[in-house]
Amino acid sequence: SLSQESTAFVFDQALFDDEEVEVLSTDGGKRIAASLGEAKLCILRNHGLLTVGRTVEEAVGWFVMAERVAEVHVKAPNGKAISDAAAAIAADTMAGGLTGWRVFQWLRRSLLDN
């Protein structure tokens, strides 16, 4: 983890490292779901990010956060990683479901008029 935001996913992510290029098929979806397991973020090789949540709002919030985390990793490839111990402490705050929902609420307020 390079950022506080990344601790939301550091212990709760999966990788779909398959050569599958057709992710919209039922079989492809089943393989992705198997890779995802109970995680909230799945990085799909050659496709991008997939997030899930208890609500659509939470899933969107997690996606926005995951995209930001990816951006930080691209911009700071040699950044000093947060230790696992510190990441575990931060994850207690950052990884809860309300965090994803709150990110969505911020996004909605930022982009949409009342």
Where in the sequence are the language-model features?
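Glycine-rich flexible loops
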Residues: 1-114
